[in-house]
Curated annotation (Swiss-Prot):
It catalyses: a ubiquinone + NADH + 5 H(+)(in) = a ubiquinol + NAD(+) + 4 H(+)(out). This is NADH-ubiquinone oxidoreductase chain 4. The keyword Cell membrane does not apply. The keyword Transport applies.
Length: 461
Protein backbone atom coordinates (compact mmCIF):
# COMPACT_ATOMS: atom_id res chain seq x y z
CA UNK A 1 0.00 0.00 0.00
CA UNK A 2 2.81 2.41 0.88
CA UNK A 3 4.36 1.70 -2.53
CA UNK A 4 1.49 3.71 -3.99
CA UNK A 5 0.69 6.19 -1.21
CA UNK A 6 4.24 7.50 -0.64
CA UNK A 7 5.09 8.12 -4.34
CA UNK A 8 1.71 9.80 -4.77
CA UNK A 9 2.37 11.99 -1.74
CA UNK A 10 5.80 12.91 -3.13
CA UNK A 11 4.14 14.26 -6.27
CA UNK A 12 3.15 17.35 -4.26
CA UNK A 13 6.72 18.57 -3.49
CA UNK A 14 7.75 17.48 -6.99
CA UNK A 15 5.07 19.77 -8.40
CA UNK A 16 6.53 22.82 -6.66
CA UNK A 17 10.23 21.99 -7.09
CA UNK A 18 10.33 20.86 -10.73
CA UNK A 19 11.51 23.35 -13.35
CA UNK A 20 8.56 24.81 -15.25
CA UNK A 21 9.95 23.48 -18.55
CA UNK A 22 9.70 19.89 -17.29
CA UNK A 23 6.66 20.29 -15.03
CA UNK A 24 4.04 18.54 -17.16
CA UNK A 25 6.26 15.81 -18.70
CA UNK A 26 7.82 14.99 -15.34
CA UNK A 27 4.58 14.83 -13.35
CA UNK A 28 2.78 12.90 -16.09
CA UNK A 29 5.60 10.33 -16.25
CA UNK A 30 5.71 9.91 -12.47
CA UNK A 31 1.95 9.50 -12.19
CA UNK A 32 1.96 6.99 -15.05
CA UNK A 33 4.60 4.91 -13.25
CA UNK A 34 2.43 4.97 -10.11
CA UNK A 35 -0.60 3.84 -12.12
CA UNK A 36 1.39 0.95 -13.61
CA UNK A 37 2.61 -0.04 -10.15
CA UNK A 38 -1.00 -0.12 -8.95
CA UNK A 39 -1.72 -2.94 -11.42
CA UNK A 40 0.05 -5.31 -9.02
CA UNK A 41 -3.16 -5.26 -6.95
CA UNK A 42 -4.82 -7.29 -9.72
CA UNK A 43 -2.41 -10.18 -9.22
CA UNK A 44 -3.36 -11.07 -5.67
CA UNK A 45 -5.59 -14.12 -5.88
CA UNK A 46 -6.76 -14.03 -2.26
CA UNK A 47 -10.51 -13.85 -1.68
CA UNK A 48 -9.93 -11.98 1.58
CA UNK A 49 -8.15 -8.73 2.30
CA UNK A 50 -4.52 -8.13 1.39
CA UNK A 51 -1.99 -5.30 1.82
CA UNK A 52 -3.83 -4.85 5.12
CA UNK A 53 -3.24 -2.86 8.30
CA UNK A 54 -5.40 -1.44 11.08
CA UNK A 55 -6.86 1.49 9.14
CA UNK A 56 -6.54 0.54 5.47
CA UNK A 57 -6.92 -2.62 3.46
CA UNK A 58 -7.44 -3.72 -0.12
CA UNK A 59 -9.80 -6.45 -1.24
CA UNK A 60 -11.51 -7.45 -4.45
CA UNK A 61 -14.22 -4.81 -3.96
CA UNK A 62 -11.88 -1.85 -3.66
CA UNK A 63 -9.14 -3.02 -6.06
CA UNK A 64 -10.84 -2.07 -9.38
CA UNK A 65 -11.74 1.42 -8.16
CA UNK A 66 -8.31 1.98 -6.61
CA UNK A 67 -6.59 1.08 -9.88
CA UNK A 68 -9.05 3.26 -11.81
CA UNK A 69 -8.22 6.17 -9.48
CA UNK A 70 -4.47 5.75 -10.03
CA UNK A 71 -4.95 5.28 -13.78
CA UNK A 72 -6.95 8.49 -14.09
CA UNK A 73 -4.33 10.94 -12.75
CA UNK A 74 -1.93 10.78 -15.76
CA UNK A 75 -4.96 10.98 -18.06
CA UNK A 76 -6.17 14.15 -16.33
CA UNK A 77 -2.70 15.69 -16.60
CA UNK A 78 -2.47 14.87 -20.32
CA UNK A 79 -5.96 16.27 -20.94
CA UNK A 80 -5.35 19.50 -18.99
CA UNK A 81 -1.92 20.41 -20.33
CA UNK A 82 -3.10 22.40 -23.34
CA UNK A 83 -6.01 23.93 -21.42
CA UNK A 84 -3.67 25.40 -18.77
CA UNK A 85 -0.71 26.32 -20.97
CA UNK A 86 -1.58 30.03 -20.88
CA UNK A 87 -2.00 30.16 -17.10
CA UNK A 88 0.75 31.49 -14.80
CA UNK A 89 3.08 28.74 -13.64
CA UNK A 90 1.98 29.10 -10.00
CA UNK A 91 -1.62 28.37 -10.97
CA UNK A 92 -0.53 25.36 -13.00
CA UNK A 93 1.31 24.01 -9.96
CA UNK A 94 -1.73 24.65 -7.75
CA UNK A 95 -3.97 22.81 -10.22
CA UNK A 96 -1.71 19.75 -10.27
CA UNK A 97 -1.51 19.83 -6.47
CA UNK A 98 -5.31 19.74 -6.26
CA UNK A 99 -5.43 16.71 -8.56
CA UNK A 100 -2.79 14.86 -6.52
CA UNK A 101 -4.55 15.73 -3.26
CA UNK A 102 -7.82 14.46 -4.72
CA UNK A 103 -6.18 11.18 -5.74
CA UNK A 104 -4.73 10.71 -2.26
CA UNK A 105 -8.14 11.31 -0.70
CA UNK A 106 -9.81 8.82 -3.03
CA UNK A 107 -7.17 6.13 -2.43
CA UNK A 108 -7.64 6.45 1.33
CA UNK A 109 -11.44 6.45 0.97
CA UNK A 110 -11.49 3.28 -1.13
CA UNK A 111 -9.07 1.46 1.18
CA UNK A 112 -10.44 2.58 4.58
CA UNK A 113 -11.55 -0.13 7.00
CA UNK A 114 -12.85 2.33 9.61
CA UNK A 115 -16.15 3.89 8.61
CA UNK A 116 -15.26 7.21 10.25
CA UNK A 117 -12.04 7.37 8.19
CA UNK A 118 -14.08 6.57 5.10
CA UNK A 119 -16.47 9.40 5.99
CA UNK A 120 -13.63 11.91 6.49
CA UNK A 121 -12.02 11.01 3.16
CA UNK A 122 -15.46 10.99 1.52
CA UNK A 123 -15.92 14.61 2.64
CA UNK A 124 -12.36 15.75 1.94
CA UNK A 125 -12.81 14.93 -1.76
CA UNK A 126 -15.28 17.82 -1.82
CA UNK A 127 -12.55 20.44 -1.19
CA UNK A 128 -10.21 19.93 -4.21
CA UNK A 129 -13.16 19.19 -6.50
CA UNK A 130 -14.87 22.43 -5.48
CA UNK A 131 -11.66 24.42 -5.98
CA UNK A 132 -11.12 22.89 -9.43
CA UNK A 133 -14.69 23.71 -10.51
CA UNK A 134 -14.86 27.27 -9.16
CA UNK A 135 -11.32 28.35 -10.06
CA UNK A 136 -10.71 26.66 -13.41
CA UNK A 137 -14.26 26.47 -14.75
CA UNK A 138 -14.95 28.15 -18.06
CA UNK A 139 -17.93 30.41 -17.36
CA UNK A 140 -19.36 32.58 -14.61
CA UNK A 141 -22.00 29.92 -13.89
CA UNK A 142 -19.25 27.81 -12.30
CA UNK A 143 -19.83 29.63 -8.99
CA UNK A 144 -23.50 28.61 -9.04
CA UNK A 145 -22.47 25.05 -9.92
CA UNK A 146 -20.01 25.00 -7.03
CA UNK A 147 -22.72 26.16 -4.63
CA UNK A 148 -25.06 23.39 -5.78
CA UNK A 149 -22.30 20.82 -5.45
CA UNK A 150 -21.33 22.00 -1.96
CA UNK A 151 -24.79 22.16 -0.43
CA UNK A 152 -26.15 18.97 -1.98
CA UNK A 153 -23.10 17.03 -0.80
CA UNK A 154 -23.12 18.48 2.72
CA UNK A 155 -26.88 18.11 3.15
CA UNK A 156 -26.64 14.45 2.22
CA UNK A 157 -23.48 13.72 4.22
CA UNK A 158 -24.31 15.21 7.63
CA UNK A 159 -27.02 12.59 8.39
CA UNK A 160 -24.42 9.90 7.62
CA UNK A 161 -22.12 11.31 10.31
CA UNK A 162 -24.96 11.19 12.85
CA UNK A 163 -25.77 7.61 11.79
CA UNK A 164 -22.13 6.52 12.18
CA UNK A 165 -21.88 8.08 15.66
CA UNK A 166 -25.13 6.32 16.60
CA UNK A 167 -23.73 3.02 15.30
CA UNK A 168 -20.55 3.51 17.32
CA UNK A 169 -22.48 4.20 20.51
CA UNK A 170 -24.47 0.98 20.10
CA UNK A 171 -21.72 -1.38 18.87
CA UNK A 172 -18.50 0.17 20.21
CA UNK A 173 -16.70 -0.06 16.86
CA UNK A 174 -16.81 1.30 13.33
CA UNK A 175 -14.40 -1.26 11.87
CA UNK A 176 -15.81 -3.00 8.82
CA UNK A 177 -14.00 -6.20 9.79
CA UNK A 178 -15.71 -6.31 13.20
CA UNK A 179 -19.13 -5.13 12.03
CA UNK A 180 -19.35 -8.19 9.77
CA UNK A 181 -19.21 -10.39 12.89
CA UNK A 182 -22.07 -8.65 14.71
CA UNK A 183 -25.68 -9.88 14.49
CA UNK A 184 -27.42 -7.67 11.97
CA UNK A 185 -30.98 -7.99 13.24
CA UNK A 186 -32.23 -4.52 14.17
CA UNK A 187 -35.67 -3.89 15.75
CA UNK A 188 -38.21 -2.28 13.44
CA UNK A 189 -38.54 1.11 15.13
CA UNK A 190 -38.85 4.62 13.71
CA UNK A 191 -35.43 5.50 15.12
CA UNK A 192 -33.85 2.60 13.25
CA UNK A 193 -35.77 3.51 10.11
CA UNK A 194 -34.25 7.00 10.33
CA UNK A 195 -30.80 5.54 10.96
CA UNK A 196 -31.12 3.28 7.90
CA UNK A 197 -32.19 6.25 5.75
CA UNK A 198 -29.33 8.43 7.02
CA UNK A 199 -26.79 5.71 6.16
CA UNK A 200 -27.84 5.64 2.52
CA UNK A 201 -28.78 9.26 1.87
CA UNK A 202 -25.20 10.54 1.42
CA UNK A 203 -24.42 7.87 -1.15
CA UNK A 204 -27.70 8.42 -2.99
CA UNK A 205 -26.88 12.12 -3.37
CA UNK A 206 -23.31 11.35 -4.45
CA UNK A 207 -24.21 8.87 -7.18
CA UNK A 208 -26.74 10.62 -7.70
CA UNK A 209 -30.25 9.19 -7.33
CA UNK A 210 -32.84 10.73 -9.63
CA UNK A 211 -34.39 13.61 -7.69
CA UNK A 212 -31.13 14.48 -5.94
CA UNK A 213 -29.23 14.82 -9.22
CA UNK A 214 -29.60 18.54 -9.94
CA UNK A 215 -26.06 19.35 -8.81
CA UNK A 216 -24.41 16.97 -11.28
CA UNK A 217 -25.35 18.56 -14.67
CA UNK A 218 -24.32 21.98 -13.36
CA UNK A 219 -21.02 20.79 -11.89
CA UNK A 220 -20.27 18.56 -14.88
CA UNK A 221 -20.92 21.26 -17.47
CA UNK A 222 -19.03 24.06 -15.72
CA UNK A 223 -16.02 22.01 -14.57
CA UNK A 224 -12.78 21.98 -16.59
CA UNK A 225 -11.83 18.79 -18.36
CA UNK A 226 -10.04 17.25 -15.35
CA UNK A 227 -13.02 18.05 -13.11
CA UNK A 228 -15.46 16.45 -15.54
CA UNK A 229 -13.26 13.36 -15.85
CA UNK A 230 -12.90 12.79 -12.11
CA UNK A 231 -16.62 13.46 -11.55
CA UNK A 232 -17.72 10.97 -14.19
CA UNK A 233 -15.06 8.33 -13.55
CA UNK A 234 -14.50 8.27 -9.78
CA UNK A 235 -16.61 10.55 -7.58
CA UNK A 236 -19.96 9.12 -8.69
CA UNK A 237 -18.60 5.61 -8.15
CA UNK A 238 -17.65 6.56 -4.59
CA UNK A 239 -21.38 6.56 -3.82
CA UNK A 240 -21.86 3.06 -5.24
CA UNK A 241 -18.84 1.80 -3.33
CA UNK A 242 -20.26 3.31 -0.13
CA UNK A 243 -23.58 1.52 -0.63
CA UNK A 244 -21.80 -1.82 -1.05
CA UNK A 245 -19.64 -1.25 2.03
CA UNK A 246 -22.36 0.10 4.34
CA UNK A 247 -24.82 -2.65 3.39
CA UNK A 248 -23.11 -5.08 5.79
CA UNK A 249 -24.37 -2.97 8.71
CA UNK A 250 -27.95 -2.71 7.43
CA UNK A 251 -30.52 -5.19 8.63
CA UNK A 252 -32.19 -7.43 6.04
CA UNK A 253 -35.39 -7.00 8.05
CA UNK A 254 -35.60 -3.44 6.70
CA UNK A 255 -35.61 -4.50 3.07
CA UNK A 256 -39.02 -2.83 2.57
CA UNK A 257 -37.32 0.53 3.02
CA UNK A 258 -35.26 -0.13 -0.11
CA UNK A 259 -38.34 -0.26 -2.34
CA UNK A 260 -38.75 3.53 -2.79
CA UNK A 261 -35.06 3.91 -3.68
CA UNK A 262 -35.22 0.97 -6.07
CA UNK A 263 -38.35 2.20 -7.83
CA UNK A 264 -37.06 5.78 -8.03
CA UNK A 265 -33.73 4.63 -9.47
CA UNK A 266 -35.46 2.56 -12.17
CA UNK A 267 -37.81 5.43 -12.98
CA UNK A 268 -34.78 7.75 -13.06
CA UNK A 269 -33.19 5.60 -15.78
CA UNK A 270 -36.19 6.28 -18.02
CA UNK A 271 -36.44 9.98 -17.18
CA UNK A 272 -32.76 10.87 -17.54
CA UNK A 273 -32.45 8.85 -20.76
CA UNK A 274 -35.45 10.74 -22.13
CA UNK A 275 -33.82 14.03 -21.08
CA UNK A 276 -30.69 13.01 -23.01
CA UNK A 277 -32.75 12.67 -26.19
CA UNK A 278 -33.89 16.30 -25.80
CA UNK A 279 -30.50 17.82 -24.96
CA UNK A 280 -28.79 20.36 -27.18
CA UNK A 281 -25.74 20.70 -24.88
CA UNK A 282 -23.14 17.96 -25.40
CA UNK A 283 -21.62 17.99 -21.90
CA UNK A 284 -25.06 18.13 -20.30
CA UNK A 285 -26.06 15.03 -22.28
CA UNK A 286 -23.00 13.17 -20.99
CA UNK A 287 -23.85 14.25 -17.42
CA UNK A 288 -27.43 12.95 -17.65
CA UNK A 289 -26.08 9.76 -19.21
CA UNK A 290 -24.02 9.25 -16.03
CA UNK A 291 -27.16 9.66 -13.90
CA UNK A 292 -28.94 7.07 -16.04
CA UNK A 293 -26.18 4.48 -15.64
CA UNK A 294 -25.87 5.11 -11.91
CA UNK A 295 -29.60 4.39 -11.59
CA UNK A 296 -28.82 0.76 -12.43
CA UNK A 297 -26.05 0.66 -9.81
CA UNK A 298 -28.40 2.08 -7.15
CA UNK A 299 -31.06 -0.51 -8.01
CA UNK A 300 -28.41 -3.24 -7.72
CA UNK A 301 -27.22 -1.94 -4.36
CA UNK A 302 -30.76 -1.98 -2.95
CA UNK A 303 -31.63 -5.38 -4.40
CA UNK A 304 -31.91 -8.44 -2.15
CA UNK A 305 -29.93 -10.80 -4.43
CA UNK A 306 -26.36 -9.56 -3.81
CA UNK A 307 -24.53 -12.42 -5.46
CA UNK A 308 -25.65 -11.23 -8.89
CA UNK A 309 -26.67 -7.61 -8.40
CA UNK A 310 -23.51 -6.46 -6.62
CA UNK A 311 -21.34 -8.22 -9.19
CA UNK A 312 -23.08 -6.22 -11.90
CA UNK A 313 -22.71 -3.04 -9.87
CA UNK A 314 -18.95 -3.59 -9.53
CA UNK A 315 -18.51 -4.25 -13.26
CA UNK A 316 -20.66 -1.29 -14.31
CA UNK A 317 -18.98 1.04 -11.80
CA UNK A 318 -15.53 0.38 -13.25
CA UNK A 319 -16.29 0.17 -16.96
CA UNK A 320 -18.64 3.15 -16.91
CA UNK A 321 -15.86 5.23 -15.33
CA UNK A 322 -13.59 4.63 -18.32
CA UNK A 323 -16.35 5.18 -20.88
CA UNK A 324 -17.72 8.44 -19.50
CA UNK A 325 -14.26 9.85 -18.89
CA UNK A 326 -13.48 9.16 -22.56
CA UNK A 327 -16.69 10.91 -23.63
CA UNK A 328 -15.76 13.94 -21.49
CA UNK A 329 -12.38 14.14 -23.24
CA UNK A 330 -13.97 13.92 -26.67
CA UNK A 331 -16.47 16.64 -25.77
CA UNK A 332 -13.64 18.86 -24.55
CA UNK A 333 -11.55 18.42 -27.70
CA UNK A 334 -14.56 19.13 -29.88
CA UNK A 335 -16.30 21.85 -27.86
CA UNK A 336 -13.51 23.93 -26.36
CA UNK A 337 -10.51 23.43 -28.63
CA UNK A 338 -12.16 23.44 -32.06
CA UNK A 339 -15.81 24.49 -32.40
CA UNK A 340 -15.79 26.64 -29.21
CA UNK A 341 -19.39 25.64 -28.55
CA UNK A 342 -21.12 22.83 -26.68
CA UNK A 343 -24.19 23.05 -28.92
CA UNK A 344 -24.76 19.89 -30.94
CA UNK A 345 -26.21 21.78 -33.91
CA UNK A 346 -23.07 23.90 -34.29
CA UNK A 347 -20.63 21.00 -34.49
CA UNK A 348 -21.97 18.58 -37.06
CA UNK A 349 -20.12 16.64 -39.73
CA UNK A 350 -16.77 16.52 -37.96
CA UNK A 351 -16.12 12.95 -39.08
CA UNK A 352 -15.17 14.16 -42.57
CA UNK A 353 -12.65 16.64 -41.12
CA UNK A 354 -11.28 14.54 -38.23
CA UNK A 355 -11.85 10.89 -39.23
CA UNK A 356 -9.73 9.30 -36.48
CA UNK A 357 -11.50 11.35 -33.84
CA UNK A 358 -14.76 10.07 -35.33
CA UNK A 359 -13.50 6.53 -34.74
CA UNK A 360 -12.93 7.32 -31.05
CA UNK A 361 -16.45 8.76 -30.87
CA UNK A 362 -17.89 5.57 -32.38
CA UNK A 363 -16.01 3.24 -30.00
CA UNK A 364 -16.92 5.32 -26.94
CA UNK A 365 -20.59 5.49 -27.86
CA UNK A 366 -20.76 1.78 -28.59
CA UNK A 367 -19.26 1.09 -25.17
CA UNK A 368 -21.68 3.58 -23.59
CA UNK A 369 -24.70 1.86 -25.13
CA UNK A 370 -23.45 -1.49 -23.72
CA UNK A 371 -22.73 -3.25 -26.99
CA UNK A 372 -21.74 -6.90 -26.40
CA UNK A 373 -19.19 -8.00 -25.30
CA UNK A 374 -18.17 -4.72 -23.64
CA UNK A 375 -17.87 -4.66 -19.81
CA UNK A 376 -20.80 -2.22 -19.69
CA UNK A 377 -22.97 -4.89 -21.28
CA UNK A 378 -21.78 -7.51 -18.78
CA UNK A 379 -22.62 -5.22 -15.87
CA UNK A 380 -26.02 -4.20 -17.22
CA UNK A 381 -27.13 -7.72 -18.15
CA UNK A 382 -26.07 -9.03 -14.72
CA UNK A 383 -28.03 -6.31 -12.91
CA UNK A 384 -31.07 -6.79 -15.16
CA UNK A 385 -31.02 -10.55 -14.50
CA UNK A 386 -30.85 -9.99 -10.74
CA UNK A 387 -33.70 -7.47 -10.87
CA UNK A 388 -35.80 -9.86 -12.98
CA UNK A 389 -35.26 -12.62 -10.40
CA UNK A 390 -36.40 -10.20 -7.70
CA UNK A 391 -39.46 -9.01 -9.66
CA UNK A 392 -40.32 -9.84 -13.25
CA UNK A 393 -42.02 -6.43 -13.68
CA UNK A 394 -38.66 -4.65 -13.54
CA UNK A 395 -37.81 -6.02 -16.99
CA UNK A 396 -40.19 -3.45 -18.51
CA UNK A 397 -38.31 -0.48 -17.06
CA UNK A 398 -34.82 -1.91 -17.58
CA UNK A 399 -35.53 -2.90 -21.19
CA UNK A 400 -36.99 0.52 -21.93
CA UNK A 401 -33.94 2.10 -20.31
CA UNK A 402 -31.64 -0.02 -22.50
CA UNK A 403 -33.55 1.07 -25.61
CA UNK A 404 -33.34 4.74 -24.67
CA UNK A 405 -29.63 4.41 -23.84
CA UNK A 406 -28.94 3.02 -27.31
CA UNK A 407 -31.07 5.79 -28.81
CA UNK A 408 -29.31 8.73 -27.18
CA UNK A 409 -25.86 7.18 -27.71
CA UNK A 410 -26.51 6.91 -31.45
CA UNK A 411 -28.10 10.38 -31.40
CA UNK A 412 -24.94 11.79 -29.79
CA UNK A 413 -22.74 10.16 -32.42
CA UNK A 414 -24.88 11.16 -35.40
CA UNK A 415 -25.32 14.76 -34.26
CA UNK A 416 -21.60 15.33 -33.77
CA UNK A 417 -20.09 13.29 -36.60
CA UNK A 418 -22.57 13.02 -39.46
CA UNK A 419 -24.37 15.58 -41.61
CA UNK A 420 -23.19 18.73 -43.34
CA UNK A 421 -20.36 20.65 -41.70
CA UNK A 422 -21.48 24.18 -40.68
CA UNK A 423 -19.98 26.99 -42.74
CA UNK A 424 -18.36 28.66 -39.73
CA UNK A 425 -16.14 25.59 -39.19
CA UNK A 426 -13.81 26.40 -42.07
CA UNK A 427 -10.56 26.33 -40.07
CA UNK A 428 -10.47 23.31 -37.74
CA UNK A 429 -7.16 22.48 -36.10
CA UNK A 430 -5.94 18.93 -36.79
CA UNK A 431 -5.80 16.36 -34.03
CA UNK A 432 -2.61 15.81 -32.07
CA UNK A 433 -0.75 12.72 -30.89
CA UNK A 434 -1.46 13.79 -27.31
CA UNK A 435 -5.20 13.50 -27.92
CA UNK A 436 -4.99 10.08 -29.55
CA UNK A 437 -2.71 8.85 -26.76
CA UNK A 438 -5.27 9.98 -24.21
CA UNK A 439 -8.14 8.21 -25.97
CA UNK A 440 -6.04 5.05 -26.38
CA UNK A 441 -5.29 4.99 -22.64
CA UNK A 442 -9.02 5.31 -21.95
CA UNK A 443 -10.27 2.61 -24.27
CA UNK A 444 -7.44 0.04 -24.36
CA UNK A 445 -8.20 -1.14 -20.76
CA UNK A 446 -11.66 -2.18 -21.93
CA UNK A 447 -10.11 -5.04 -23.95
CA UNK A 448 -8.58 -6.99 -21.01
CA UNK A 449 -11.76 -6.35 -19.02
CA UNK A 450 -13.75 -8.00 -21.83
CA UNK A 451 -11.39 -10.97 -21.91
CA UNK A 452 -11.15 -11.42 -18.13
CA UNK A 453 -14.12 -9.74 -16.41
CA UNK A 454 -13.43 -11.51 -13.09
CA UNK A 455 -10.81 -8.81 -12.48
CA UNK A 456 -13.57 -6.36 -11.60
CA UNK A 457 -16.53 -8.39 -10.38
CA UNK A 458 -15.52 -8.35 -6.72
CA UNK A 459 -16.32 -11.04 -4.16
CA UNK A 460 -19.90 -11.70 -5.12
CA UNK A 461 -19.88 -14.01 -8.14
Amino acid sequence: MLKILLPTLMLIPSTWLTNKKWLWPSLTSQSLIISLLSLMWFFNQSETTHFSNYLMTIDQISTPLLILTCWLLPLMLIASQNHLSNEPISRQRTFITMLVFLQLSLIMAFSATELILFYIMFEITLIPTLIIITRWGNQAERLNAGTYFLFYTLAGSLPLLVALLSLYSSTGTLSLNLLQLLPNHIPMTWANYSWWLACLLAFMVKMPLYGTHLWLPKAHVEAPIAGSMVLAAILLKLGGYGIIRISITLSPSMKELAYPFLILSLWGIIMTSSICLRQTDLKSMIAYSSVSHMGLVISAGNNQTPMKALTGAMILNTSDGLTHSALCCLAKYQSYERTHSRALLLSRGLETILPLMGTWWLISNLANMALPPSPNWMGEITIMTALFNWSSWTIILTDLGTLLTASYSLYMFLMTQRGMTPEHLNAINPTHTREHTLMTMHLIPIIPLMMKPELIWGLFF
